[in-house]
């Protein structure tokens, strides 16, 4: 009997233990479900990590310097750069030894000082012995070619304003101060195709406030040139070593004048570059150091061998 009572008392105890375990398990399950429900009830975090924006990497050294023989290149130096330029054009070579192929003939020279106060913007001042001209110029890089190809070209805008400072007399025909001014505007579009080869094309627009005319048989003053002139320039660079490139350009006036059309220019030469200097020596048939003078008045004909020797020297300092 004791065994039966003992056995009988064990079964309810075991049952109570099992029931307690089941209840605890059920409570734990309910608590877990409640916690899960609470977690599920929380609004999902919809914020995502900001995408990593890669900084654009621009193509460098499309050309070696500011000049491409007689034309501006697409390049604008880095911020804080001072640049001093000396440009020289000798006389034409067709007279041979009589003037040492133009080296001892009359020559044009220009000095130019420029500075880059902010990124992509260059301002400059120049002076030339040609008609005692002084000029102010601005160059702004609008678009730059990227290495990943997202921007395939560089685009730069160049503008100058030139003042003829010669004394007014019957040869200069200056009546008003505004008669002394001329202007030049150019959009330069360039692409660096490889580490060694670059091309650029540049449509330009020039304007002279005052131009000489002539009298016809009736005594009426007639224009020789239009006051506005359009032209297209094409230039290229082929790098042959770390410090040397072959350079060339072609300038084609577009506007037809009433009496005297300008002749196109063909130039080719060598560009030698160091860390702080750029030196170009070349032969071509543009004799002026003013782009608007060249596109308006050039009469040197390359078909007749009317070429001249010229050079550009640039010295750069960065602060």
Predicted regions: what is each one?
Residues 1-37:
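Bacterial Sec-dependent N-terminal signal peptides
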Residues 245-248, 258, 280:
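Extended hydrophobic-aromatic, low-complexity segments
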């Amino acid at each position: 009997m004791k065994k039966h009572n003992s056995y009988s008392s064990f079964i309810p105890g075991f049952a109570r233990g099992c029931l307690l375990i089941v209840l605890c398990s059920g409570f734990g399950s309910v608590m877990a479900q409640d916690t899960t429900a609470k977690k599920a009830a929380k609004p999902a975090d919809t914020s995502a990590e900001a995408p990593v924006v890669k900084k654009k990497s621009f193509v460098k050294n499309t050309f070696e310097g500011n000049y491409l023989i007689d034309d501006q290149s697409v390049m604008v130096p880095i911020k804080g750069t001072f640049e001093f330029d000396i440009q020289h054009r000798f006389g034409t070579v067709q007279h041979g030894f009589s003037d040492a192929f133009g080296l001892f003939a009359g020559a044009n020279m220009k000095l130019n000082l420029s500075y880059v106060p902010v990124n992509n913007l260059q301002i400059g001042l120049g002076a030339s012995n040609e008609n005692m001209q002084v000029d102010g110029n601005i160059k702004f890089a609008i678009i730059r070619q990227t290495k990943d190809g997202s921007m395939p070209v560089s685009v730069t805008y160049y503008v100058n304003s030139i003042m003829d400072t010669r004394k007014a007399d019957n040869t200069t025909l200056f009546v008003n101060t505004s008669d002394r001014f001329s202007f030049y505007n150019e959009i330069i579009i360039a692409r660096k195709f490889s580490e060694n080869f670059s091309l650029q094309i540049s449509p330009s627009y020039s304007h002279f406030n005052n131009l000489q005319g002539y009298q016809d048989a009736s005594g009426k003053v007639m224009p020789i040139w239009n006051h506005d002139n359009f032209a297209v320039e094409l230039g290229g660079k082929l790098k042959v070593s770390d410090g040397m490139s072959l350079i060339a350009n072609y300038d084609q006036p577009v506007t037809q004048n009433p009496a005297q059309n300008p002749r196109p220019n063909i130039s080719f030469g060598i560009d030698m570059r160091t860390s702080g200097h750029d030196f170009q020596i070349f032969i071509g048939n543009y004799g002026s150091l003013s782009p608007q003078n060249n596109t308006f008045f050039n009469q040197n004909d390359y078909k007749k061998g009317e070429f001249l020797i010229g050079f550009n020297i640039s010295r750069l300092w960065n602060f």
